[in-house]
Amino acid sequence: LNSKKFPNSRGIFGRQDITNASKGSVNVGKMTVYVAIGRSKFLPPILLCNARQAARVYAVGESVKTAAVGGGTGKEMLRQTGFNPFIYFSPDKDTRMLQQIMEKHPDFQFVLLNTGHIGEMKIPKEMSQEALNWFFRAADPKLECEELPNGMWMRKADRKFYPDFDVFLANLNEWEADRTNYLKNHPDFKSYTFIQ
């Protein structure tokens, strides 16, 4: 890789340089999207978040520990506000700013991409790619989604992963309760009520 272009050892490639990339236009106009990547054990491949849920996802910053943050195996859970140990402001201020931006700018979108598991099934990279392609190409993604009790939006097509939807909703409630407890006890979120 050209280190002048990729100083952090990550690569960006033009679509014309990728053999099996689609040849059609991918111009989708101006979009402002924050894609958070996590590894859940039960969430669907993609979820759309409202301002409150985006703030909660950002505040908890739940992912897995990898070599990039200290030689992890990819299995140990890690919680880091903003998914980043180098956020500019305090965790509280950074999270507030994200929520305020989303509330003031309805066109700003926040997506949670699950690259972990759905039950025993490992989510393959092709499924993640398909989910993102769907999101960026859909005229209005929410028209193909249903709103969950916690305020997130899930693709109707992804119900196929949950033969017993009540079990999924119970897991979702448990997940929410765990995140709420974490934030309430986090020293940097003294005024947690703004994302309850």
What is each model feature region?
Residues L1-N2:
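Phosphate/diphosphate-binding loops
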Residues K5, G11-Q196:
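Conserved NTP phosphate-binding and transfer environment spanning the P-loop NTPase/kinase superfamily
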